[in-house]
Amino acid sequence: DEVAGNFTRLKFSMEHVGGYHFFREALAVICNNHHRASDPRRVYAGLTSIMPDDNGLPDYWTLSDDELLPLIHQGDDDCAIFGLDFPYKKADYAKALINRIISLDISEEAQEGILGKNLEHALGMD
């Protein structure tokens, strides 16, 4: 939060959204900086490592639907981006992550944002 506040022209992606253990702190940074910045979005939630383990439970770096849905709701549809982390994983893993995002109970607009439009905006390509 302090770094984002001190470097107001820099954009951040908080990969793993703090993971299981620091999720609430990361959510606070995302929301705090969304509401006080002149650019509506400078701190993003990186949603690449979000698959639960084989038992359906989150591990150190993944998030459950109980965390993802409030993140998207509280941070607004433009808070999350996909695809910056884990570029070395296999295609099947990436497909499973995309399908997980598509299966969330969120609007099609939110899905499109997470899967590309929010990153386009962050990079000034829109």
Predicted features along the sequence, with ranges:
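Mid-to-C-terminal alpha-helical segments outside catalytic/metal-binding sites
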Residues: 74-79, 87-126
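Catalytic pocket-lining loop regions of alpha/beta-barrel enzymes
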Residues: 1-81
